[in-house]
Amino acid sequence: SPGTKNGKSDMSSYLRDTTLVPLLKEAEEGKRAVFFIDAAHFVLAPFLGYLWCFTRLFLKAPSGRQRFNVLGALNAITHELITITNETYINAQSVCDLLWKISRLNLSMPITFILDNARYQRCTTVNTLAAQLNLELIILPPYSPNLNLIERLWKFVKKQCLYSKYYSEFANFKNAITDCLQKTHSNYKRELDSLLTLNFQTFNKSHFVNL
């Protein structure tokens, strides 16, 4: 029989309606800059597409598991992408570097960042710098990637660069991702303008079902 409604879905719907929608309306009117922030961790490993055949196939796979980390900030309206990258790990300092980078753009309007609930993004260090730079941070509820616009961009990049692709060297792997990210505002603009619309699905009608 059906159980109770998912409380996290209610939180997502509430934040979308009371916070995101008004902020994005201001952004559309040119009164505010809204950036969606998230980190993607690209690992040099096989990313297989779909394949059906009668015989077993052996596919080339790169050795090692080197990572190329990208912390990105996606402008909700222009779809401009600003990044901090490394090959180690993303932490609070990475977020601070990104805040500084955007602050130095000297945008003549209030700036709001939409971030997920990762601990390094909501720590004291990040909050202190944001207050110092007069930047607003909006932390999304746990498990609500549907409200973070940049998640769609990461899926697009993986499809373009990783699925069913083989890279023998980490440098080639990294260059392919970097090249794709640099073309988001040019070669891929039409596709991304269609993908990155400000429509956010929530699941407030979902129920747990006991089978």
Question: What spans do the regions from the language model cover?
Answer:
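Short functional hotspots at interaction and active-site rims
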Residues: 1-211
